[in-house]
Swiss-Prot record:
InterPro entries: Pept_tRNA_hydro, Pept_tRNA_hydro_CS, Pept_tRNA_hydro_sf. The gene is pth. It catalyses: an N-acyl-L-alpha-aminoacyl-tRNA + H2O = an N-acyl-L-amino acid + a tRNA + H(+). Pfam families: Pept_tRNA_hydro. It is found in: Cytoplasm. Belongs to the PTH family. Its main location: cytoplasm. The active site is at residue 19. The record marks 9 as: Discriminates between blocked and unblocked aminoacyl-tRNA. It comes from Mycoplasma capricolum subsp. capricolum (strain California kid / ATCC 27343 / NCTC 10154). This is Peptidyl-tRNA hydrolase. The record marks 91 as: Stabilizes the basic form of H active site to accept a proton. NCBIfam families: pth (TIGR00447). The lineage of its organism: Bacteria, Bacillati, Mycoplasmatota, Mollicutes, Mycoplasmataceae.
């Protein structure tokens, strides 16, 4: 079983915001890789798909970003998921818009959702797919920037870029190594 978790904040007011890039990515993946069922469990929406004969859970935590780690820990423990079978998708202000990059372990780099996951799993050793949202201009506070909405052009660019790399799911479900994914898609 594989688990792909997209980070974001719940609520209409957060739709299409930069901090919800993980939710946007999950929605794009679900358009391409149809799901068989959806249920609410562990404070999250869990969409179940079968891809390459492999069960895949696409997850959107229903907690706020700062508490995402609680959901991730519960899912990992309940389904007995090896961390090599987990990818967390999140926004990253240090990458340009439309830049999509795989990363293995490391610090949170100030991302509160990732910080929550690290704290709850007691490890930094999990795979991430970072989605660039650009650095804010000087007049922006970081918190205001990540909660601002993408422009239509930015959103289209992000969708196009992500869709071009969404084939990573096929490689991931065919048990390709994460190093392989980084070399192929970064």
């Amino acid at each position: 079983m594989k688990v792909i978790i997209g980070l974001g904040n719940i609520g209409k007011e957060y739709e299409k915001t930069r901090h919800n890039a993980g939710f946007i990515a999950i929605d794009l993946l679900l358009e391409k890789y149809k799901y068989n069922s959806i249920k609410e469990e562990f404070n999250s929406l869990v969409y179940t798909s079968i891809i390459n004969n492999q069960k895949v859970l696409f997850v959107k935590p229903l907690t706020f970003m700062n508490n995402s780690g609680l959901t991730v820990k519960q899912i990992i423990n309940f389904y007995k998921i090896d961390l090599n079978d987990l990818i967390v998708i999140h926004d990253d202000k240090d990458l340009n818009i439309s830049r999509i990059q795989f990363k293995k372990d490391g610090s949170s780099a100030g991302h509160n959702g990732i910080k929550s996951i690290i704290n709850n799993l007691n490890t930094q050793d999990f795979y991430r797919l970072r989605i660039g949202i650009n650095k804010p201009a000087n007049q922006w506070k970081i918190v205001d920037w990540v909660l601002s909405k993408f422009s239509d052009d930015e959103l289209n660019l992000l969708k196009e870029s992500f869709n071009n790399k969404s084939e990573f799911i096929n490689d991931f479900t065919n048990n390709k190594t994460f190093t392989y994914l980084m070399n192929k898609y970064n």
